Swiss-Prot record:
Binds 1 FMN per subunit. This is Pyridoxine/pyridoxamine 5'-phosphate oxidase. FMN binds at R62, M63, V64, L65, L66, K67, F77, T78, K84, Q106, Q141, S142, W186, R196. It is an enzyme of class 1 (oxidoreductase). The gene is pdxH. Catalyzes the oxidation of either pyridoxine 5'-phosphate (PNP) or pyridoxamine 5'-phosphate (PMP) into pyridoxal 5'-phosphate (PLP). Pathway: Cofactor metabolism; pyridoxal 5'-phosphate salvage; pyridoxal 5'-phosphate from pyridoxamine 5'-phosphate: step 1/1; Cofactor metabolism; pyridoxal 5'-phosphate salvage; pyridoxal 5'-phosphate from pyridoxine 5'-phosphate: step 1/1. It catalyses: pyridoxamine 5'-phosphate + O2 + H2O = pyridoxal 5'-phosphate + H2O2 + NH4(+); pyridoxine 5'-phosphate + O2 = pyridoxal 5'-phosphate + H2O2. Its cofactor is FMN. GO terms for molecular function: FMN binding; pyridoxamine phosphate oxidase activity. Keywords: Flavoprotein, FMN, Oxidoreductase, Pyridoxine biosynthesis.
Amino acid sequence: MDISIADLRLDYNLEELLESETSADPFIVFKQWLERAVSSGRLEPNAMTLATISPEGKPRARMVLLKDFDPRGFVLFTNYHSAKGQELIANPNAALVFWWGELQRQIRIEGTVEKISEEESDNYFFVRPWESRLGAWASNQSEVISGRDILEKRLTELKEEYAGREVPRPPHWGGFRLIPSLIEFWQGRPSRLHDRLCYYRQEDGSWQRQRLAP
């Protein structure tokens, strides 16, 4: 089947994004938008693109899951030895993007990351399914392996080792919090004249909101 990518287009006309109807606090807006995405029935509405910077200064991006947020920032979990973990440790500048196509909405976030506390990482790790906790031990994330059988063999060994027991959190596994300096909300509109409200964090911790041309 031939696909004409140039002809793929959608008319955005679901909603509008107005200052008069939007909170001055971007975290309140984010919560409202996330709740709407969850109620829409979208598969994994907490999925987001995480962009990092490689040691060579090149951008890298992949999908991850948001696992918590509050006025301090947005939390994700990973293996600290993984490519993204090492990149975030070496260069804390990062960006997140949420795309909810059914709602014709996007959120773009820029900021810097920091490791969350050991206690916070423990609290999340121990609510994960038992086999997911084993998986954190089984995989040396981002390392080259000869085949999947290596992972399956290691998982089987760990199941035997921890049968009937709690699985501890690996010291190399935990969370990062992205502390935002910019949060932009995008709502699709007709004629490609989309609504964009961008919040910029000020030195005193407050937020300045500005409308951007689409």
